[in-house]
Design a protein with these regions (language model features):
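Phosphate-group recognition and catalysis centered on beta-loop-alpha active-site segments
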Residues: 1-170
Length: 170
């Protein structure tokens, strides 16, 4: 098991980056604001139809974009052109975020459950996430509510710390 980097213990994390009415959640503008404030970030990942890890919370586009459809039904290029809220920014890829952050603050990446009910995993989001992280030099940890996704990450040989997110645990 890979230990959690010390940076996670010493840095506050902005949930979905530092967002507000002008900077949509999980956007590069929200990430820039978190960086400027000295915060690390927790962001959410969904897969595109071509297997790219996209920085987006919901499985569907409606709440954040006003568009119909599931994130996983669009390519990364198509998603990058879909406007987030009232901003002019499109949905960023994980690679976009990593380029912006460049190892300066810790990133906690939540891989969103793709099957519902924490069922199995097809491995698409896990593979896209690990591909984006290849060669990245900065503090990162990966987590999911779906234990199967955490298991797939481990089986794929993730060099990053892995965690299981939970709630109402008794």
């Amino acid at each position: 098991m890979n230990p959690l980097p010390d940076a996670f213990r010493n840095t506050a994390l902005a949930h979905r980056a530092l967002h507000d009415d002008l900077r949509p959640e999980n956007s590069l503008a929200a990430a820039e604001a978190a960086l400027a404030a000295g915060y690390g970030m927790e962001v959410d990942l969904q897969p595109s139809s071509d297997g790219v890890a996209m920085v987006f919370h919901d499985a569907t586009l409606a709440r954040m974009t006003g568009r119909d459809g599931r994130v996983r039904d669009f390519t990364a290029v198509e998603l990058s052109q879909i406007q987030l809220g009232e901003s002019e920014a499109g949905i960023p890829t994980l690679s976009d975020l990593l380029s912006l952050v460049a190892g300066r603050v810790p990133l906690l990446l939540e891989l969103k459950d793709q099957r519902g009910g924490q069922g199995g995993s097809d491995g698409v989001l896990e593979a896209g996430t690990l591909k984006a992280l290849e060669g990245y030099d900065g503090p990162v940890a990966l987590m999911s509510f779906n234990p199967a996704m955490v298991e797939v990450l481990a089986e794929m040989g993730s060099a990053w710390p892995l965690g299981l997110t939970t709630c109402d645990f008794r």
